[in-house]
Amino acid sequence: MDNEEWFPLKQTHYPPPTIPSMKTGHPTGPISIGHIIPDLRHLDNVINCKGFEPFPPNMDVFTAHYEQCHFGDHLNSEFVVQAKAAAPIKNIVPGVDVTGSAGLHHTNITSDRWEYDSVVEYAVYPTRQYIDRLLESKEVKQYIQKSKKLLGGWCVYMVTGIMVARGGGRNVVSEEKGAGVFGNVGFQVPGIGEXAPEVGWDTKTKTKVNAHHTTDFVCAIRLVKIAKSGLRSSWTMKKVTREF
């Protein structure tokens, strides 16, 4: 499983659809393979929510099972202030040059993740013929007409995979803070070498469980980008990955 291919959903109230319902184009859940969404900021804003074309025989639904998985985001911030002597400080001790630097260092690392004991991945590999039929559906066609850009370009995203958390999961938030004063004084002694004593650093970590969900739900989706520029005669399809 490649985490970069999966986009976590912020909500936990999306019950998973069954495989037969997805194959027939009438999924029993609000988020399904075959759904079309407008952009990466609105992962649950389904355009063709009333249904879609049934999957052809050559578009089977593949499954994979994983244990002990987690998805989440990390937000790092770092603040450093440093001062350094502009030139070696001479003549404090005859024959010894002294250099120095000192500063403040503060870091804050926040982790917001979901942990799952068991997840099941459902995925399809859509054909161009099938996507052509999806794009001709009433809701998708109307959206494309309204959202066309300069020279007639447009873009939508198709859900090609869903990840289902079996038995729910835990939302864990942890924060690590570090702060300290650092500094060193360097001594250059002819014939002996250099010495540079330094001071230390302190970190604190705090972890808490924000929520514990106990029923199956769709926790992430996999997407392909379907786009057409005004200079091309046909649309293109590209797998989408998250940026970390």
UniProtKB/Swiss-Prot annotation:
GO biological process: programmed cell death
Keyword list, A-Z: Cell membrane, Cytoplasm, Membrane, Necrosis, Transmembrane, Transmembrane beta strand
Main subcellular localisation: cytoplasm
GO molecular function, one term: protein heterodimerization activity
Keyword Iron: no
Disordered, as annotated region: 1-22
Gene Ontology terms: cellular component: cytoplasm; plasma membrane
Compartment(s): Cytoplasm; Cell membrane
Superkingdom field: Eukaryota
Membrane topology: Multi-pass membrane protein
Quaternary structure and interacting proteins, as annotated: Heterooligomer; the heterooligomer with rcd-1-1 forms a ring-shaped pore complex when inserted in the membrane.
Function of the protein: Gasdermin-like protein involved in heterokaryon incompatibility, a process that ensures that during spontaneous vegetative cell fusion, only compatible cells from the same colony survive (non-self-recognition). In N.crassa, the rcd-1 locus exists as 2 incompatible alleles, rcd-1-1 (AC Q7SBA0) and rcd-1-2 (this entry). During the allorecognition process, forms a heterooligomer with rcd-1-1, thereby forming a functional gasdermin-like complex that binds to membranes and forms pores, triggering cell death. Binds negatively charged phospholipids, such as cardiolipin and phosphatidylserine.
Family: Belongs to the gasdermin family.
Protein name, as recorded: Gasdermin-like protein rcd-1-2
Lineage: Eukaryota, Fungi, Dikarya, Ascomycota, Pezizomycotina
Gene that produces this protein: rcd-1-2
